[in-house]
Structure formats: structure tokens, C-alpha cells
Design a protein with these regions (language model features):
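Metal-dependent nuclease catalytic cores that hydrolyze phosphodiester bonds in DNA/RNA
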Residues: 1-126, 130, 258
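Metal-dependent nuclease catalytic regions and adjoining charged, substrate-binding loops involved
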Residues: 1-5, 11-16, 20-21, 165-258
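A residue-level signal for conserved active-site and pocket-lining positions in enzyme catalytic cores
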Residues: 32, 66, 162, 211, ...
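Short catalytic/ligand-binding loop motif for oxyanion handling, primarily in non-cytosolic enzymes
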Residues: 37-38, 45-47, 141-145, 185-189, ...
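Residue-level detector of secondary-structure boundary/capping sites
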Residues: 56-57, 153, 233
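Mg2+/Mn2+-dependent nuclease catalytic core
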Residues: 98-213
Length: 258
């Protein structure tokens, strides 16, 4: 509880203690510096959407499935089916900590005094001893799954942050990570109390060179008392949240004049 309370305190310019930023806050900054500033400085958060309970359940079931092979030291069928027979789920005493949302893999970025953390889905290891970051994704669409859409840059940045965090902890990490991307089929006759999925293993070659410059920009932003510019929406155009706040404020002020 103490950890959560400290983490929820607003940033104070010039503070000496490290300021915790999650992987999702880095993504928030990349999307909209203003939303990030409001969150970090004033604890004004974006409204949250509904929980993705089915996606979370799929994540947990995948973890159980891969953990069986982790304990046995054997590759999962999705590995062998994709030519990764020498790859196995990685065993480490801190794996459960790395997976836990409120701890994750952590690293202090000393130049900015930002304490970065992020909860991974899974880690594999190849024959060279390199760790492989793995992220589970779930969806339902008629077309096949990919990571090629513009908005999926967030998926790629997510993986790169995890790769960077593990490297900051002294691990040798492969540039190539994998998305275990499962797609609920809609071409079946009915529901029948079950969903059928088709799963695809998608490789991605990460590059974490953007992370440390971004952390420097984040630190400069929260040190500044002025709100930064509005960012971009995932599908293009100004940030949806900032646009809503602007229009609602304008309408409210107009109403108060009456």
C-alpha cells in the first residue's frame, strides 16, 4: 500500500526522490504530452475505459500454458511450429514480480531520476542465452492479425520498453521479440458457450534507442510549470481527450454567460 501511495503523488519540480513512471505513462507521453503533464503534475487522469476482462483471462490462460513448459524445460508447440525448437520459456526467480502490474521489471534512469517499470507477459530464452520479450495480444476480426496498422506503433513501443528494462537489469536481450496474437473466429456457426481462436506468432525487431531521449523529454516536461501542446489521437488528429475537454469548457463558459 505504501508503494501505491508514493507512486500516486504528483511530481514536484526539483524533487530529489525518484519519480515512478510506468510503461503506460511513457506511451501516454508519446501520444499526448499535455495529458501526461496533467497526470504527473496534477493527477488529473484520462477517463478509463471498461476493463478488458476477456483479454485478461486469455493472458492468464496463456501464462498457465507456457508455465507448464517452463517447469518442464520444453518448447511450447507454437515455438516448434514456427521453427523455434531451441527456444524455451525462461525460468527466473523474479518472473512473477516482473509480471505483476504494480512492480514489473524496474530500472532507475539516473540522468532523469525517473524510476521506470513495466509488467511483462512472458520471457523466453534462445540457444545463445538471449532473453526474448513476449507479449500476448487478443482480438476478434474477420481479417488476419498483424502489427502493421499505424496505431499499433504502441504495441511496438511497449515491447521496446520491456527490452530496455531487462537490459538495464544486466540481461542480454534479443532485438527480436514475439507477439502471441490470438484472434477469436467469427466464421463459425454459433457461440455454444465457447469461442474458437486462431493464434499467430508475429516476430518484431525492436529498437530501444528512442527511450532515453524520451525520458529526458518527459523530465523536462514535468519540470515545466506550463502545460505542453496537445498531442495526437491514435487514429490521427488532435488528442480526443484534449478536444473533448476544450469543447466542453467552451460550451460551459458560453452557458455561464447566459
Amino acid at each position: 500500500m505504501a508503494y501505491t501511495n508514493r507512486r500516486s503523488q504528483p511530481y514536484r519540480p526539483g524533487q530529489s526522490e525518484p519519480f515512478k513512471v510506468s510503461r503506460s505513462k511513457i506511451e501516454l507521453f508519446k501520444q499526448c504530452p499535455r495529458c501526461f503533464w496533467l497526470d504527473a503534475r496534477l493527477k488529473i487522469k484520462r477517463p478509463s475505459g471498461p476493463p478488458f476482462n476477456i483479454n485478461k483471462t486469455i493472458d492468464e490462460l496463456y501464462k498457465k500454458e507456457f508455465d507448464k513448459h517452463r517447469a518442464a524445460g520444453t518448447p511450447h508447440p507454437i515455438m516448434t511450429d514456427n521453427g523455434l525448437g531451441a527456444v524455451v520459456p525462461y525460468q527466473h526467480a523474479d518472473l512473477n514480480t516482473w509480471r505483476y502490474n504494480f512492480t514489473g521489471v524496474t530500472a532507475l534512469h539516473k540522468p532523469t531520476n525517473l524510476h521506470v517499470f513495466g509488467a511483462i507477459d512472458d520471457v523466453w530464452v534462445n540457444e545463445d542465452g538471449e532473453l526474448i520479450v513476449v507479449d500476448y495480444k487478443a482480438t476478434s476480426k474477420a481479417s488476419g492479425v498483424s502489427i502493421d496498422s499505424d496505431w499499433q506503433i504502441s504495441y511496438k513501443r511497449q515491447m521496446e520498453v520491456y527490452q530496455w528494462l531487462l537490459r538495464q537489469n544486466g540481461f542480454t536481450v534479443s532485438d527480436t521479440g514475439y507477439f502471441v496474437y490470438t484472434n477469436a473466429r467469427i466464421d463459425v456457426e454459433g457461440f455454444g458457450d465457447r469461442l474458437e481462436f486462431t493464434t499467430k506468432l508475429i516476430p518484431y525487431t525492436g529498437n530501444d534507442a528512442w527511450i532515453e531521449p524520451t525520458l529526458a523529454d518527459m523530465k523536462a516536461t514535468i519540470e515545466n510549470n506550463d502545460m505542453p501542446p496537445v498531442g495526437m489521437a491514435a487514429m490521427g488528429g488532435p488528442c480526443d481527450f484534449c478536444e473533448y475537454a476544450k469543447k466542453r469548457t467552451e460550451l460551459t463558459l458560453e452557458h455561464l454567460k447566459k
